[in-house]
Amino acid sequence: MITQRQNDILNLIVELFTQTHEPVGSKALQRTIDSSSATIRNDMAKLEKLGLLEKAHTSSGRMPSPAGFKYFVEHSLRLDSIDEQDIYHVIKTFDFEAFKLEDMLQKASHILAEMTGYTSVILDVEPARQRLTGFDVVQLSNHDALAVMTLDESKPVTVQFAIPRNFLTRDLIAFKAIVEERLLDSSVIDIHYKLRTEIPQIVQKYFVTTDNVLQLFDYVFSELFLETVFVAGKVNSLTYSDLSTYQFLDNEQQVAISLRQSLKEGEMASVQVADSQEAALADVSVLTHKFLIPYRGFGLLSLIGPIDMDYRRSVSLVNIIGKVLAAKLGDYYRYLNSNHYEVH
């Protein structure tokens, strides 16, 4: 355990170092810490012995170690902090016409990446928590059709498929009827379960040959189990990490799994400092924040960057963008649920 003065010294070194990326000496600390230079140097030496500070090779100053950054995050960083200077810029950047949910999520991801110079990832509501609220099949030709699904009464998912060779028009109608009877208004996780239990038994009542029918069910509904992921600033990862992080960001489904694991049950925000279970993220910091998607649940806003990032500003930007995004989404869903022709 460190003393209050040592904690103040560590916090100030973290603040100065993340702004300048230069080692911090006792003289720079004396302007804020009300103690002699010798006392400050003694405390810095103790912090170094504890592994919270490191010596610079080219200077007598000190800089935070990964353990020092982690201590700062766990003991001094407020995860709900907001810097009012950035609010106007974020609101102004969000002033655009969005035609669908994905436009706003992608925009938010780009804004965060551009304002930090790091990598931003945004996830839609977790697939398992969404519900199938609409389903239709549109025959495009004699040989292919389009399954049109609606999740949470607002999110469309379309899957084009080749009509099985032995299918007649009545078979497509039966396929749609089974979905409406057994899967409509079910959660995605329940659909996954029913496809393995109920549906094989039901299909036998409607079809003589069931193999290609069950394959069709699996193909059409497999899209629902995938995370909707928006990555921005991927190239930025090369400036603060190695190629493994850059390549990992290509696997969006695995990225989504890792980010969801970074939040404990019931947590709204977290900061991991070189603490991810994923090897490609083991030497970086990951800030994760839940934001409200009205009527549907929570999305995830994450920032991936270097261990020596400016945590106060990064947390502030994540909070601001999360709040502005939630407000924009609220307006968007209110518009979808309103009478399009009403006079405002």
Swiss-Prot record:
Gene3D superfamilies: 3.30.450.40, Heat-inducible transcription repressor hrca homolog, domain 3, Winged helix-like DNA-binding domain superfamily/Winged helix DNA-binding domain. Pfam families: HrcA, HrcA_DNA-bdg. Keywords: Repressor, Stress response, Transcription, Transcription regulation. One of its GO terms (biological process) is negative regulation of DNA-templated transcription. GO terms for molecular function: DNA binding. The keyword Transcription applies. InterPro entries: GAF-like_dom_sf (IPR029016), HrcA (IPR002571), HrcA_C (IPR021153), WH-like_DNA-bd_sf (IPR036388), WH_DNA-bd_sf (IPR036390), WHTH_HrcA_DNA-bd (IPR005104), WHTH_transcript_rep_HrcA_IDD (IPR023120). Coiled coil: none annotated. Negative regulator of class I heat shock genes (grpE-dnaK-dnaJ and groELS operons). Prevents heat-shock induction of these operons. NCBIfam families: hrcA. Belongs to the HrcA family. PANTHER family: HEAT-INDUCIBLE TRANSCRIPTION REPRESSOR HRCA. This is Heat-inducible transcription repressor HrcA. The gene is hrcA.
